[in-house]
């Protein structure tokens, strides 16, 4: 498989579906924001995308809703509609069409180059009522030991 690297700016995102169709690997370098904590660290981790042949609940996807690129987890699919939510978010979702999903994250890449497959987040999604406290502990722990 050939490597095709794409930066996560809006101008280059239009290339993602074409690169994936050509069988290339698309890596979004150092994603911004903290909405996917603790699984993807903004400004630190990169993600590798694959073609979105079948999107399912639990997948982490790159979507463009209303011209805005988002890397979040799928929490619901209803027909052709998909609902996303960041793992680090306590509330708020994004809704759009499945056709707006450009790619599925199949690897999370740390700065050391270590790759790991994203989990389905099933347990994390069920912890939504206590996620606020878990994220607070995570952030404090990270400040002390990072």
Task: List each language-model region with its residue ranges.
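Extended hydrophobic leader/signal-anchor segments used for secretion and membrane insertion
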Residues: 1-146
């Amino acid at each position: 498989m050939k490597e095709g690297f794409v930066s996560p700016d809006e101008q280059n995102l239009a290339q993602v579906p074409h690169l994936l169709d050509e069988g290339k690997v698309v890596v979004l370098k150092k994603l911004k924001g903290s909405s996917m904590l603790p699984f993807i660290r903004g400004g630190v981790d990169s993600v590798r995308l694959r073609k979105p042949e079948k999107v399912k609940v639990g997948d982490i996807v790159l979507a463009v809703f209303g011209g805005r690129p988002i890397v979040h987890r799928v929490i619901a699919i209803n027909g052709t509609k998909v609902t996303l939510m960041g793992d680090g978010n306590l509330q708020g979702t994004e809704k759009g069409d499945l056709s707006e999903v450009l790619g599925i994250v199949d690897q999370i890449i740390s700065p050391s180059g270590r790759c790991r497959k994203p989990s389905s987040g099933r347990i994390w999604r069920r912890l939504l009522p206590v996620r606020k406290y878990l994220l607070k502990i995570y952030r404090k722990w990270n400040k002390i030991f990072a």
